[in-house]
Amino acid sequence: MQRAFTSSRASVLSSASSTRAPLSRFRSAGVGLQQQRFAHKELKFGVEARASLLKGIDTLAKAVTTTLGPKGRNVLIESPYGSPKITKDGVTVAKAVTLQDKFENLGARLLQDVASKTNEVAGDGTTTATVLARAIFSETVKNVAAGCNPMDLRRGIQSAVEAVVEYLQTNKRDITTTEEIAQVATISANGDTHVGKLISNAMEKVGKEGVITVKDGKTIDDELEVTEGMRFDRGYVSPYFITDTKAQKVEFEKPLILLSEKKISAVQDIIPALEASTSLRRPLVIIAEDIEGEALAVCILNKLRGQLQVAAVKAPGFGDNRKSILGDIGILTNATVFTDELDLKLEKATPDMLGSTGSITITKEDTIILNGEGSKDAIAQRCEQIRSVISDPATSDYEKEKLQERLAKLSGGVAVIKVGGASEIEVGEKKDRVVDALNATRAAVEEGILPGGGTALLKAAANGLTSLNPTNFDQKLGISIIKNAITRPARTIVENSGLEGSVIVGKLTDDFAGDFNRGFDSARGEYVDMIGAGIVDPLKVVRTALVDASGVASLLGTTEVAIVEAPEEKVPAGSGAGGMGGGMGGMGGGMF
């Protein structure tokens, strides 16, 4: 028995030692694969590189441009989770595309970046930017292949873009009426007048700088909810302050407001405010960095006994931003903010230092102040101060975002558009259109409007480039590239409507070149005054699309080398079997 055990053990040891060689081969093969995977790159040069990039750009642009115009088609996109997505939003389509060939995918990704950047700045115009970038790059590639200097072509392109932007800014029209706002929103929502009216109503109620958000609704119909006043994301400190147990919220009419930048813990700090609340028979709301200890206990005790109506809320924001928001609330409610800088003590508060508002609603998560009794002039002055800081070049993007939020809360209110629909797919598609329409409307309010349907760019091609004086022939070709490229959006819109684009574009640039507003209504198939017909584009959208597209496309034209990661090479199928064969041989040797 002992002998058998020893023999068996020797056999296993023998087989283990004999398998070391094939294991080392596996390890060396793994190292080789890693070297292949991380060290190997593929390069393409010159015409071949630009041709691959152009092929990728053409593929992506073909998918995106089908959505352009009133008769543009939808795109169905597979989703890794849940239902497929149906959309007519250019940037959504662009982001969904990944190509198998890595060089082609490089071009597609650059075009995706153009669409994303345009969407980020203007909120719309991504399809127009894609059309322009494709047209500019394809013409640049042809001219570079013919022997033109790519740097001079780029200089000509950039000078032409600057001239077009200047021409558009000269001929823009400021948006003034609710009807014009509705027209802009309707066009961007693919001709949906209901969406246009919804957005114009929201903007009318909360102001042009008011906060408008878009959310998924829970019913079939679209809904608009408007909060007129200031809302911030801080709720009650203790549930003992609740006045409406069913809705779990605090509601006061005509409350007094006490504002403090510091924590309140000592009871003597709030006694003057509590006495004012009692004598005036009005509720008291304390907004401070925090309220704790004896001060909080006294407030809760008085509330539970029914001796006075009181509630406490933590101040919104952090650091300097909290200080600024408290100042905004002070202006809105005509309250004094107790701060260290003013050397004001809470125990010396007088009734005239307390603010006042029409009503206040406090939930667990947020507080809404309605109809603050602050001076209209003081509020307007505060808004102007915030605008001046926003326009300061030294202000960071993060600070601008916070300042915009403060300005919106002071100047208007908050509107929520709840998008309804019968299914998740329908709600998602409609929500994309509503967001596009909202972004386009904001852009129109900010910089003005132009005749839509690509008309403004067509007229710029006919009239906006005549004053340029290129220094050489290649720069002249660069200007010509832009002149041809900016006719492409109008041509694409017409072709998506099933008509002959070159004929209609030719008529607009030849017969109607002198009439800036005269364009072609692709939905009805008529030549009309585009502004009069309500077919408009925001200047900011058109300008951003052209600048972004020309910048990337002309830079691509100067590309001489493209480098990508080489595809991973698979391990040959026979290598694993060979290793096993060696192992089996070793086992056989051990047995004998």
Swiss-Prot record:
Swiss-Prot/TrEMBL keywords: ATP-binding, Chaperone, Mitochondrion, Nucleotide-binding, Stress response, Transit peptide
UniProt entry tagged with the keyword Transport: no
GO cellular component, one term: mitochondrion
SUPFAM superfamilies named in the record: GroEL apical domain-like, GroEL equatorial domain-like, GroEL-intermediate domain like
Localization, UniProt: Mitochondrion
UniProt cross-references to CDD domains, sorted A to Z: GroEL (cd03344)
Predominant location: mitochondrion
Gene Ontology BP annotations: protein refolding
Molecular-function GO terms, alphabetical: ATP binding; ATP-dependent protein folding chaperone
A Pfam family per the record: Cpn60_TCP1
Family matches, as HAMAP family: CH60 (MF_00600)
NCBIfam families assigned to the protein according to its UniProt record, in alphabetical order: GroEL, PRK00013.1, PRK12849.1, PRK12850.1, PRK12851.1
UniProt similarity note: Belongs to the chaperonin (HSP60) family.
Biological role stated in the UniProt entry: May participate in assembly and/or disassembly of proteins imported into the mitochondrion. HSP60 are ATPases and have affinity for unfolded proteins.
Protein name as annotated: Heat shock protein 60, mitochondrial
Source species: Paracoccidioides lutzii (strain ATCC MYA-826 / Pb01) (Paracoccidioides brasiliensis)
